[in-house]
C-alpha cells in the first residue's frame, strides 16, 4: 500500500479571502491552531492541483484553508467563483468561502498605523487602492457563505469569531456566542438575533456608577431594580431557549445573539452575562464577548440625561 489517499467525500476546503488589511493573516493563523492545513497566497492556477494532491492516510480528514486575495498570481474573482462551482459539481468536496470585509475608513487607519502600502496603490493614497479592491472583490463577497465585517473587531475578537465558526462543535450543536455592544458604536454585522436593552434605566447618568460596567455588582443591582427588568429579560431567555433547538434542527453551525445598549458598557453587558449564565444552566456552552466594555464612557454618546420629573419617578 502506498500509505496515501485521495481526498474523500468528507474533505473540507475553506477559501479565505477579502479586503487587504481586513484580517486574513489572523484568520489563517487561528485555523492553523485549530488543526487546519493552511496555504496562503496560492496562485489560482494551482488551486485544483492542491486539492487533488494525494495526502497521507492519517491526514485525509484534515481540513484545508487556502488564502487567496488580490495579490495572488492570476487572481480574478469571477474566474475563482466559476472554478469553485466546477469543483463543487465534481463532487466529494465541501468547499466554502470566508470573505473578510471592513469599512474603508478603518482600513485606512490600519494601513496608516502599520505604515504599509496598499497592494493596489503602491504610489497612491491607500483610499484609492481600497476603493479599487472593494469593487474588484464584490463578486466574491456576494458568493461567500461566510462574510465577517472586522471593522469593530480587535485581533482577539476576530480570533474568537473564527474559533466559533470553524472550531469543532459537539453533537451537532451550533457554536453559540453571546455578545454585548453599544448602538452608538455601530450594530454588529454578524448577529442572528439583536435585543435592544435601552428601555432599561441607564446607570451612565448616576455619577457613582458611570465609571463602572455591567459586570460590577452595584451596576447590576441598579439595572435589576428597573420594574421592567425581570419580566422582559425572562421572556427573552425563554424565547432564546425555544429558538436554539430549532436553529439546530435547521442545521445552523453557529448562532450569535447580541444585546445592545447605548454605549455598550452597562445594561447590555449585565444582560448578556445573565443570559449566558442561564444558557449554561440549560446545558449550552456559549462564549461571552463584550465588544465595547473597554470603551471610555462618553456623555455625547448617551443622549440627554433623564429629566428631573422622570428621575423622581424612579427612572433616574
UniProtKB/Swiss-Prot annotation:
Superkingdom assignment: Bacteria
Listed GO MF terms: ATP binding; GTP binding
Disordered, as annotated region: 283-316
Binding-site residues, ATP: 18-25
Keywords, ordered alphabetically: ATP-binding, GTP-binding, Nucleotide-binding
A Pfam match: PapZ_C
InterPro entries assigned: P-loop_NTPase, RapZ-like, RapZ-like_N, RapZ_C
Residues noted as binding GTP in the record, renumbered to the chain: 69-72
Functional note: Displays ATPase and GTPase activities.
Similarity annotation: Belongs to the RapZ-like family.
Protein name in UniProt: Nucleotide-binding protein Sala_2050
Lineage, uppermost ranks: Bacteria, Pseudomonadati, Pseudomonadota, Alphaproteobacteria, Sphingomonadales
